[in-house]
Every structure is written in C-alpha cells, then in structure tokens.
C-alpha cells in the first residue's frame, strides 16, 4: 500500500469521526439520579433541562440538595464522556 493511499484513508477516517462527534454533540440524553433528579443534557455537555422532585426541596437542608445536584450532573457528564469515547475508539483501526 502506498503512502498517498494511506493518507487518503486516514483523512477519510478522520472526517467520518469528526462527523460522528458533531452528530453526537447535538444528541440529547436524559439521566435520572436516584429517581429524584432528571437531567436532559446534550452530547456537548450543555444542560438543557433539570427537574428536581419537589420532595427534595427542604429549605432547612439546602446543602443536601446542592450535593445531590452536583452528583447528578457529574454522573451525567461521566456517562456522556464514556459514550463519546466509544465513538472515538470505535473509529480507530487499531
């Protein structure tokens, strides 16, 4: 296989991967944390919507709610990152 053909294949693969990533970044995902917090988030980590069960809202325990929101967002981001890695690793020939 000559070098020019290899470069063309690499460019085609890169272009295909970039397209998949752009599509993924516009996809919307929904995550539910402990059946209490629902997060809608795009593949580019943009949070679209968050719904918090009203039973969690306790003016006397603001810290607990803040911690749960942080944990829910972090879990959603981790899941998106894992899915994105599957796309990028799946496109690599080695």
Curated annotation (Swiss-Prot):
This is Nucleoid-associated protein MYPE8070. Pfam families: YbaB_DNA_bd. Gene3D superfamilies: Nucleoid-associated protein YbaB-like domain. InterPro entries: YbaB-like_sf (IPR036894), YbaB/EbfC (IPR004401). Belongs to the YbaB/EbfC family. The keyword Cytoplasm applies. Keywords: Cytoplasm, DNA-binding. It is found in: Cytoplasm, Nucleoid. GO terms for molecular function: DNA binding. It comes from the Bacteria. The keyword Membrane does not apply. HAMAP family: DNA_YbaB_EbfC. GO terms for cellular component: bacterial nucleoid; cytoplasm. Homodimer. Binds to DNA and alters its conformation. May be involved in regulation of gene expression, nucleoid organization and DNA protection.
